[in-house]
């Protein structure tokens, strides 16, 4: 709307003709930064901290790895953007373009060890988030999510951006910690086991019991889940 509004004025000033009346999703003047420090003892020790930093270095050095590294970060960011009625596609486009436009590496995050051996993580990406107008102001679910976050309207867009970036940083920490220890497949398999438990009709405490027995069996399948559920209920 703003681009279309100023187009005639620009034509008058320049004597030219305006063709594209649209803004860019590369919002470099609306970058948001979040950082945190985790003591090594809360992550599993110094070896895990070193493993996370090595995984980060791999992402910095290899385009195939950084694609998955950054995608994992967006696994955390996108749901919050969607839940609050914002445009996740615009945020995705801006973040990925910015990662290649900026100087240095293409990772959205940076990880380093502090002097006392703790792990410090930082994320900085464009975050064109809004709270006035659009679905955020009209969609009942989006309004409820914003209320849960206790973000003020108007004036809370910067705070919401910080929340979203913090989620992305924590998501990346979780993924890198898993990769630096037992591997990410173990966590995925645990989630798959729980989903199967619910799918075959497990209720309440049965879900955790069934999921654990499924993992122990090494056969995380629907038919095995049904068999174990029947045994639990005997």
Question: Model-derived features: where do they sit?
Answer:
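Metallocofactor- and cofactor-centric catalytic cores in central/energy metabolism, strongly enriched
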Residues: 1, 12-15, 19, 26-28, ...
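General structural signal for secondary-structure boundaries
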Residues: 1, 11, 39, 151-152, ...
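Glycine-rich anion/phosphate-binding loop at the beta-strand->alpha-helix junction
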Residues: 2-138
């Amino acid at each position: 709307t703003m681009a279309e509004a100023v187009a005639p004025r620009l034509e008058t000033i320049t004597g030219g003709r305006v063709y594209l009346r649209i803004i860019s999703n590369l919002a470099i003047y609306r970058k948001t930064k979040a950082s945190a420090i985790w003591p090594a003892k809360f992550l599993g020790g110094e070896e895990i901290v070193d493993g996370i930093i090595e995984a980060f270095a791999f992402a910095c050095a290899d385009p195939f790895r950084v694609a998955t590294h950054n995608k994992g970060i967006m696994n955390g960011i996108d749901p919050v953007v969607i839940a609050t009625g914002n445009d996740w596609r615009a945020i995705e486009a801006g973040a990925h373009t910015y990662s290649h436009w900026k100087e240095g590496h293409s990772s959205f995050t940076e990880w380093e060890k502090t002097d006392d051996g703790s792990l410090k993580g930082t994320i900085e990406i464009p975050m064109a988030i809004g709270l006035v107008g659009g679905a955020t102001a009209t969609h009942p679910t989006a309004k409820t999510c914003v209320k849960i976050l206790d973000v003020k309207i108007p004036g809370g867009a910067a705070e919401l951006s910080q929340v979203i970036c913090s989620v992305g940083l924590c998501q990346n920490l979780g993924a890198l910690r898993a990769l630096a220890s037992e591997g990410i497949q173990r966590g995925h398999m645990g989630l798959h086991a729980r989903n199967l438990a619910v799918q075959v009709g497990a209720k309440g405490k049965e879900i955790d019991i069934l999921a654990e027995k499924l993992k122990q069996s090494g056969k995380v399948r629907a038919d095995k889940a049904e068999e174990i559920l029947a045994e639990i209920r005997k």
